[in-house]
């Protein structure tokens, strides 16, 4: 599906506030709320819009430990590892990477004990290097994708 400039404007507004009313979007781009809703539905159906989300403060939720785990496979058990990753809520992000490591995992937990348990479970798939975050200095939700600048 190709998106046009109107779809792009709708995406920009939704990116700033996913809870914005269709009517309000319509007022900003000179369309009816129903027409906006139809365009949004079409973008959802075509996979342009995959989900709507919230952003929580992990520290206020009690998740005070953030770790980055470079993971090195010791066998060709990638499918098993991916299934394991999918079941673990402590792993908030997982990326297949180039270089020496096979995967980069972002782990967010509320205690060292939980982190240690996860790391022990990972050992059946390979080895890791662990980097603990001391302080988050920037967190950016990629709104630049929706920028027209």
Curated annotation (Swiss-Prot):
Binding region for DNA: 22-41
Span of domain HTH asnC-type: 3-64
GO molecular function: sequence-specific DNA binding
Leader peptide range in chain numbering: none
Domain of life per record: Bacteria
UniProt keyword terms in alphabetical order: DNA-binding, Repressor, Transcription, Transcription regulation
A GO CC annotation given for this chain: cytosol
Pfam families (UniProt xref): AsnC_trans_reg, HTH_AsnC-type
Biological-process GO terms, alphabetical: response to amino acid
Stated role: Negative regulation of glyA transcription and kinB-dependent sporulation.
Protein name: HTH-type transcriptional regulator LrpB
Organism annotation: Bacillus subtilis (strain 168)
């Amino acid at each position: 599906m190709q998106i046009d400039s109107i779809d792009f404007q709708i995406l920009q507004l939704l990116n700033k506030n996913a809870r914005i009313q269709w009517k309000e979007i319509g007022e900003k781009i000179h369309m009816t709320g129903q027409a906006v809703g139809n365009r949004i539905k079409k973008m959802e159906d075509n996979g342009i819009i995959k989900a709507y989300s919230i952003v929580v403060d992990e520290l206020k939720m009690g998740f005070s430990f953030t770790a980055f785990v470079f993971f090195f496979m010791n066998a060709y058990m990638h499918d098993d590892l991916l299934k394991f990753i999918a079941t673990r809520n402590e792993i908030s992000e997982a990326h297949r990477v180039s270089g020496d490591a096979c995967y980069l995992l972002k782990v967010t937990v509320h205690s060292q004990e939980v982190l240690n348990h996860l790391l022990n479970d990972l050992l059946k798939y390979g080895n890791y290097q662990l980097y603990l975050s001391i302080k988050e200095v920037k967190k950016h939700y990629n709104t630049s994708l929706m920028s027209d600048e």
